[in-house]
Amino acid sequence: PDDVAYRLNLVTLSLLGGDLCMEDFSAGHISTEEARELIACLQEEFGDDEFEFYAGVSYRHLMVWRGGRDDIHMPPPHDLTGQSVTDYVPRSAASMPLMNITNAAQLLFKQHPVNVRRETEGKHAANSIWLWGQGRRPQMPTLRDKFNLSGAVISAVDLIKGIGIYAGLDVIEVPGATGYLDTNYKGKGEAALEALQSRDFVYLHVEAPDEAAHGGSLTDKIEAIERFDKDVVGTVMADIASLGDYRVLLLPDHPTPVAKMTHTKDPVPFVLAGSGVDTTAAAAEEYSEVAARKSGLVVTPGHKIMDLLVNGRLT
């Protein structure tokens, strides 16, 4: 209970006009294989009874600070793209253990073979870590406790997997799931259908549209949404009726406008379809933010959307 988990991004920092800037929050979407070499190096050099490093996918990893503090705050690195990070680096005495690790990691990574090779290939080097988004183990009911349902989670993002584990969901690993544009969309849809043969519920998460928006690429975001529509939604909807009665709920977990390149707090549009769904309650002609606003249906608080999915009504 005293352990604190920090999200650890591999990032690219650069000097711009004398300021240290966040050039790339993903270190050029470094491959998982390359990233694991760097995280293994961190663990070998700095891992001990107090700090432990865990490799994830691409640039997303974890550091556990045993008996550590959870009140040292750094903003999400994707909110700092192109900006100076100088004013966001904590300088309190309490933050020194984290800053010491960050500085040591920069020295360690400088001549690491992974980064030497990436620079030779014209790619962004993972020349620093960024520790943020910390928290302690959550206390939460499982899906079985709350709804008496069995379930699974499918995602390339360890944060989503972790929440799923605490919710009592089985983690389904899909080969080729990268959390980026090149992820295995169709494989995720197929894995969801297979999981539903022996479970009541599947949470299927795709990170690609969010990543594209954080990168400020409208072209990439459109591609990600189109592939999600065709290869995830299309794959699931083509065969789900063969499993019997069903309900499908589709929605983003938050908006990430390309123009802002970060998350906003606006309500998200959702669509619910399947057995026992009242299609006249708030029918819309299309799936979009504009159509959702016109429907007049707002689910508040947002977590009540699960009641709508499971029970077919808001409770």
Sequence positions of predicted segments:
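Feature captures the catalytic ectodomains and active-site-proximal regions of enzymes
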Residues: 1-315
